[in-house]
Amino acid sequence: MASPDWGYDDKNGPEQWSKLYPIANGNNQSPVDIKTSETKHDTSLKPISVSYNPATAKEIINVGHSFHVNFEDNDNRSVLKGGPFSDSYRLFQFHFHWGSTNEHGSEHTVDGVKYSAELHVAHWNSAKYSSLAEAASKADGLAVIGVLMKVGEANPKLQKVLDALQAIKTKGKRAPFTNFDPSTLLPSSLDFWTYPGSLTHPPLYESVTWIICKESISVSSEQLAQFRSLLSNVEGDNAVPMQHNNRPTQPLKGRTVRASF
């Protein structure tokens, strides 16, 4: 089977993406390093409010470079509000990024510090657009909550997700994943940084308002190993474990990172 036109190895990885996706060198690319001394406290930022209905959880899919947990997004049962937003954004997915070792794996970094993994909870602007497809490339189309994951204690809240990975070992496999509220994965404090950015993998649309939580969540070494044991090949092909899927940080290019705290 033909390999996708992008991935995370030397031949098709982040250094090569700009050949096919010139926006890779754009002015609003993600992830970034958050330099805390250069962030700007903004009193106009409201608290983040998430209201997710567990009944909207739908399925888990191995997409070859990661796995996605997808949600029903035909109505506003699961939404993100507040923060920098005047519109409500509808939940459609969460996924993770990780590295080949526990020393790195997050996409965003804080004062240069790399975390072991990163959770992304993704939403689209259902107040202005009629579908994810329509919203995905628009400047105000997407809102993603990023949560840094620090290696340490096992995180019991991840267990249902990890238990589901057995059923989606290889690329293209999918399985039902129901009755789950991803707000249970968020840290207890929703203090956040926010900045205008992009999807962190192709097509790299500069359509994401990022909400990066100040507080991290825990993940154990064994739990990270379960992420890496997923395979990026289709069933029957040689086993190629998903060792890493994190893009390096991109230059801020004059953007301001605002802080809610």
Swiss-Prot record:
Role summary: Catalyzes the reversible hydration of carbon dioxide. Can hydrate cyanamide to urea.
Compartments where found: Cytoplasm
Residues that coordinate or bind substrate: 200-201
Highest classification ranks of the organism: Eukaryota, Metazoa, Chordata, Craniata, Vertebrata
Primary location class: cytoplasm
Identification of the protein by name: Carbonic anhydrase 1
Positions that bind Zn(2+) 1: 95, 97, 120
In-chain residues carrying the UniProt-annotated modification N-acetylalanine: 2
Gene Ontology molecular function terms on file: arylesterase activity; carbonate dehydratase activity; cyanamide hydratase activity; hydro-lyase activity; zinc ion binding
GO cellular component: cytoplasm; cytosol; extracellular exosome
Annotated region (Disordered), positions in chain: 1-31, 241-261
Highest taxon in the source lineage: Eukaryota
Pfam families reported for this sequence: Carb_anhydrase
Gene name of the record: CA1
Domain Alpha-carbonic anhydrase intervals: 4-261
Cofactor(s) demanded: Zn(2+)
InterPro entries: CA_dom, CA_dom_sf, Carbonic_anhydrase_a-class, Carbonic_anhydrase_a-class_CS
